[in-house]
């Protein structure tokens, strides 16, 4: 019963769309109706930048931090309390699933990059660092957020086998579940990348 309560709480917490809340409160804008209609930091920056560039950067950064924290903080607490690895990985998956398929948004949501990074920094920090470097380099070169995110995801998966071939839970299944969720949410971006129609973020 205790585990079920934890899982429900994490899903509900993960479902909170901070980008949507921040832009409605501070920018009086509904990002679900503008830009890419995503609730993530990239769309926050893109939409709010048209009206207030300085505010756009602040809200985008705040969105990243809060989306990151809603996965990282609960996992840190549970890890400190010595919950087992199976539960921690389940919590990580649920936090990301909640962000991507929010119950508050009729199971729509973001794309899971910041929340995924928040979850994985607790469980696989070296892999997240590797992914961050790839994300930063790809973003710097191509200036395309989705391409940088997908490249980082690939780097994360590969490095998870290099640095942690035998995870404590003896399976990489949660890594692939998380990757599947993120790739699924990026399918429209992948299509635009193939046809060279994806917008740059400058």
Swiss-Prot record:
It catalyses: an acyl phosphate + sn-glycerol 3-phosphate = a 1-acyl-sn-glycero-3-phosphate + phosphate. It is a multi-pass membrane protein. InterPro entries: G3P_acylTferase_PlsY (IPR003811). Its EC number is 2.3.1.275. GO terms for biological process: phospholipid biosynthetic process. Belongs to the PlsY family. This is Glycerol-3-phosphate acyltransferase. It comes from Campylobacter jejuni subsp. doylei (strain ATCC BAA-1458 / RM4099 / 269.97).
